[in-house]
From Swiss-Prot:
Catalytic activities: tRNA(Arg) + L-arginine + ATP = L-arginyl-tRNA(Arg) + AMP + diphosphate
Protein name: Arginine--tRNA ligase
Coiled-coil portions: none
Gene designation per UniProt: argS
GO molecular function term, any single one: arginine-tRNA ligase activity
Record-level GO cellular component terms: cytoplasm
EC number(s) given by UniProt: 6.1.1.19
Annotated signal peptide: none
UniProt entry keywords in alphabetical sequence: Aminoacyl-tRNA synthetase, ATP-binding, Cytoplasm, Ligase, Nucleotide-binding, Protein biosynthesis
GO BP term (any one): arginyl-tRNA aminoacylation
InterPro entries listed in its UniProt record: aa-tRNA-synth_I_CS, Arg-tRNA-ligase, Arg-tRNA-synth_N, Arg-tRNA-synth_N_sf, ArgRS_core, DALR_anticod-bd, Rossmann-like_a/b/a_fold, tRNAsynth_Ia_anticodon-bd
Motif position, 'HIGH' region: 123-133
Lineage, highest ranks first: Bacteria, Bacillati, Bacillota, Clostridia, Peptostreptococcales
Amino acid sequence: MQDFKVAISNCLKEKIEDLSKEEIEALIEVPPNKDMGDYAFPCFKLAKVFRKAPNMIASELAESIEPSGEITKVIQLGGYVNFFVNKSQLAETVIKKVLDEKENYGHSDFGKDKTVIVEYSSPNIAKPFHIGHIRTTVIGNALYKIYDSQGYKTIRINHLGDYGTQFGKLIVAFKKWGEKEVVESNPIPELLKLYVRFHDEAEQHPEMEDEARAWFNKLENGDEEAQELWQWFRNESLKEFNRVYKLLDIEFDSLAGESFYSDKMNRVIELLEEKNLLKESKGARIVDLEEYKMPPALITKNDGSTLYMTRDLAAAIYRKETYDFDKCIYVVGSQQNLHFQQWFKVIELMGYDWAKDLIHVGFGMVALEEGTMSTRKGRVVFLEDALNQAIDKTKEIILAKNPNAKNVDEISKQVGVGAVVFQELSNSRIKDYTFSWERTLSFDGETGPYVQYTHARCCAVLRKAEVEVTSDIDYSLLADEDSAEVLRVIESFNKNILLALKKNEPHIVTRFMLDLAQAFNKFYHDNPILVENLEIRKARLALVLATKQTLENSLKLLGMHAPERM
């Protein structure tokens, strides 16, 4: 979008023959403090070439560059050459681009003709969709939208945990203590009670574990009763999951879970045998990874049943053959790091060069304020309850501020759910954190509602404008520092999206949104917009519209709504 970096790299290229224009442009940074200028070029890489200290090189370069056109001032700060740009041109470039591209502002064709799979959410059938699932669900959805916005063909997969020995346990528990009508009245909580009861009873009667394994083997071998019960557990669970996905406005392209690969695992075992990778170990079959300082990868148990590893290998091969992906991203908690390292290594040892395109996007664990979560003991906060409580709390706040507010239910849902989503995405994903109702639902400080309120504020100003807002304005009226700060942030939108994409870190976008909201609110506080002077009013309204559009685009990028009134 921006000609400033190009203009700066053109100036520098005349002085630096040893770097290409593209290399120079790639090195240009934005200084941490606006008093240091709009852009900075680091000279450390040139020290060996010029055989001088970086600050001396920076000083000589700064003195040799004459300000002109886009660049109004050039100074040396330490080992950097710092550039101040023409604020009127900055305003014109940014505002024209935003108002021209509208909802596509920030988008690019960076990933054109490339395919990315994002696997996320992936709850276990017949187990609670709890607050611990919020992270994979919203991080994955944000990554899907980020990649999609940059031109990738992006496929959303919900790899349901609909297979495994837990179904043997559930079948045993249901046959002993379950009632169909009771389960159908409240599926997940009732199935959870059965699952927890199985574990309590099995502590006293270990033979129940053998019974559960036998039922799972029956399921693997196509036993009719086992298959019917499994399908029923799956259908009832999906009804509950879909209510949560509807609250979050999340959809998937595929719900092919573990069971989908049950008939594709023999091929994996045959391929492993062909490559001489399988070894016997205490009756089980493994891939030995000692050479790579990892424990063995378990492929089949001693009773012949398969494991997560087998199904994950089958899924990866199927996806490569079906979608021919350039990247396959797995949004799964960091406690699974070893599993992913083993599995990616096995794919590599099988001779697949696309092993390098498998990416584990890990994230920290969620704990409750009163302790960690455990399905086996039944101590869990249901995600649907968390979202509904957020909506109810938001409704109370809105009605307390404005008892006559319209569309309260719709706005409460958009803001309440948005508060939870933003909270989940506002820190580096790798950090562990403790779930707190008070912090999540706080409407002060660096929160989702603060960003949404800033968007609604822009909309309110534009409704009162009484003039058509266009890009046909006097841009010199936006050359002040408050306006320039807003424009600098808006200009960095695509750069931040691409950085979030390259690091698979949605919190880079939440930080961008907060920076923009804070810069705009300072501008709004210090610069009256609906003034009598028509030229000033039109210029400032154009800035408001550009801010509103950019906030709306960034909120949507994270799976949040942009309410026009709050």
